[in-house]
Structure formats: C-alpha cells, structure tokens
Regions:
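A hydrophobic, multi-pass inner-membrane permease signature
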Residues: 2-310
Length: 310
C-alpha cells in the first residue's frame, strides 16, 4: 500500500514538474520574443530601402534589401570622428575607472586602515546626495574641464556601487594570503598588484562591463559640457540629434522633408531620418552585443560573490 502511495505521489510530482517546465518554457519564449523583436525590426528597417520603408509593413526582414543606409552613415566624417571619441572614452574611461575603483576598494577593505569607516561613509553618501546640475557644471568649469575630453572621464572615475562590490569581494579573500605576503616583506602595492588584483578578475570583469556600457551609452555629458565642440561629440550624441531631427520631420507632417538626398539630387539613393536612425542604433548597439557573451561567465559570479558581504 505504501509503495503504491509513493508511486502515485511520484507520478503526481512528475506531472506537476512537467506542467511547471512547460509554462516556464512558454513564458521564457514570449519574453525572448518581446526582447528580440524590437532589435530585429530595427535591423530589418536599417537593411531596407529608405523610400520603400516609408510605406511601412516591415517587421522581421527587409522587403528591398540595401546597405546604402550604412554606407551613408559611414560616409559622414562627423560620425566617424564621433565613433573614434566613443571608442576612446570607453577604453580609457573603463581602464581608469576599474583601476582606481579597485585600488580604493582594496584600501578601504583593510581593517587596519584608520579612516576606513569614514572614507566608506563619504563615498556612500554621494550615492544619495549630490551638489546638483548647476554646481556640478560650475565645478567642471573651475577645473577647466569644459571643452575637454577628460570631462567624460574624471567626474565618474569611481562608481560607488562598483566600489562596494569590489570591496566586499576583497574582504572575502583569505586574510592569510595577505599576512603571509606581509611576513615575506611585501608592501601594500605589491599585495594589491600580486594578490588582490589577480584574484579579483571575476568582479573586475563585471564592473568593467558596467563601466564600458555606461561610457559607450553616455550622451548627456556631451550635451551639457561640449555641445559646440564637434571634435568631442560621441556616437550616442549624434544618434540623439538624429532622433530629434526625425521627430521634427514627423511632426511637420511633410514626407518630402523626411528625405535627405545624398548625391546631387539623385532620386535613386535616398535615406530618411528613420532609416539612418535604425542604422545608427544597430551600429552603436553592436559592440556591447559582441562583448557581453565573453564577459557573461564572469558577470553572475563576480556580482554574486562581490555582493555577499555588501
């Protein structure tokens, strides 16, 4: 009797698991569709003839395939310069931010650091309170950062959230490693570069992704500090201007105004703000999409281990 009852419970449990797995699979598929469709639709519009796109009806694949939208984008000297600035601020900003954040995190993770609690509190307070937009602008002006590339790097060189994550990760490392190194005569810099930094690679990869995405997607600091410096514009800022022009063209209600003829009045090769916007969106999204799979294995591990003591 007991065997029969256990067999019945096991069969019922298997049925419940099957129903749960099926519903979970359907839900995840719907979620994937919701996330992928906007990107696939944007890709289809960017690969479709601009004049044909005005008719609408493009969903997952282009109706009249063309690469002219991308040729038009890459043919703009300003966009090439903006792309160079975006790459430079992402590379330099990420490297400096990760290095400085890791160094400060190591410092405040040491129990014998006298100002450990005060320094931590000072950083944490900046997460909740700031000086405001106008005082920040005045500070950047007094520091002679307006009109400079470094205005993109220095103000956000240390992210408090990233700092807390790295500090918690370092605090979780065996203290015996540092004690042994100290007995052997190693100084703080040696312990940081030879012990802490190599062991922090998972969390370093995690915050590197955070900082890189932030730097690559930033446009408001360009709008605020360097709107009149074309040589310091970024791809995201140029995309924002294209979006504004597109909205202005749509609001005017004139389809003719939406077309930009690119070759001396030729009607065979045209682009619209919508087609250029789609191409620009794919271009600025592609680097992050390509980088993320390589950092994904570190992402959950680094964030989880770094947040245990946070």
């Amino acid at each position: 009797m007991m065997k029969l009852l256990n067999k019945f419970k096991s069969r019922r449990r298997s049925l419940d698991d099957l129903v749960f797995d099926s519903l979970n699979t359907v839900f995840m598929l719907l979620l994937c569709i919701v996330m992928l469709y906007p990107m696939l639709n944007t890709l289809a519009v960017s690969l479709n003839d601009a004049a044909d796109s005005v008719r609408g009806g493009i969903f997952l694949w282009p109706r009249e395939f063309t690469l002219y939208n991308y040729e038009h984008v890459f043919g703009q000297a300003q966009l090439i310069q903006a792309g160079f600035v975006s790459v430079m601020r992402t590379v330099i900003g990420t490297a400096l931010s990760v290095f400085c954040t890791a160094m400060v995190a190591y410092t405040i993770s040491r129990q014998y650091f006298v100002l450990r609690k005060f320094t931590t509190l000072a950083f944490v307070l900046t997460m909740y309170f700031n000086g405001g937009l106008i005082p920040t602008y005045m500070l950047m002006r007094e520091l002679s950062l307006i009109g400079s590339f470094w205005v993109y790097i220095i103000p956000g060189i240390i992210g408090v959230f990233n700092l807390i994550v790295v500090r918690s990760f370092i605090e979780g490392l065996p203290e015996s490693l540092f004690e042994s190194a100290r007995i052997d005569g190693a100084g703080e810099f040696t312990m940081f570069f030879k012990i802490a930094l190599p062991l922090c690679l998972p969390v370093i990869a995690t915050i590197s992704l955070f900082v890189a995405v932030f730097q690559w997607n930033s446009w408001f600091d360009v709008f605020l500090y360097n709107p009149s410096h074309a040589n310091l514009s970024t791809l995201q800022y140029e995309l924002m201007k294209i979006l504004q022009n597109s909205n202005a063209s749509i609001s005017s209600g004139s389809a003719a105004d939406a077309f930009t003829r690119s070759q001396g009045g030729s009607t065979s090769e045209v682009v619209t703000p919508t087609s250029v916007r789609a191409a620009m969106t794919i271009i600025v999204s592609l680097p992050i999409i390509c980088v993320y799979p390589f950092l994904q294995k570190y992402f959950v591990k680094g964030l989880t281990l770094g947040g245990v003591k946070g």
